[in-house]
């Protein structure tokens, strides 16, 4: 299982990027990896070769960077459903502790973070310079 990293929140700019990328790829899913600056989730890493459609997004494991600052994953659901699927929960542990799902219509209220076990994780949105 993925170990929990000491992350105190997600940078507002990183969340804004996630929401905009999800809108831009709609009705297909968006997927990426979450990178921490040691304090906050501050960036989204786009994995080469990622493909998606209306029902799923697939990241190629052999294209994922060897990067110790990766703390989780993000993907969108093009419907109004923030619940994870069995496929989502299977992927969560492989990508890190923090696993964000965003759902249509992709506003700042349409996201949730889960642990690899499927438990909701509190992840405050903060300004990166705080």
Predicted features by range, described:
Residues 73:
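Conserved, mostly hydrophobic/aromatic
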């Amino acid at each position: 299982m993925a170990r929990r990293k000491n992350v105190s929140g997600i940078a507002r700019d990183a969340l804004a990027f996630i929401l905009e990328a999800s809108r831009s790829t709609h009705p297909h899913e968006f997927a990426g990896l979450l990178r921490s600056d040691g304090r906050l989730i501050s960036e989204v890493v786009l994995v080469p070769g990622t493909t998606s459609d209306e029902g799923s997004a697939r990241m190629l494991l052999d294209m994922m960077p060897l990067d110790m600052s990766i703390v989780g994953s993000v993907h969108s659901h093009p419907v109004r459903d923030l619940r994870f699927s069995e496929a989502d929960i299977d992927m969560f542990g492989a990508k890190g502790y923090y696993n964000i799902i965003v759902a249509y219509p992709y506003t700042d209220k349409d996201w949730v973070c889960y642990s690899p076990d499927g438990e909701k994780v509190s992840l405050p949105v903060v300004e990166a310079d705080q």
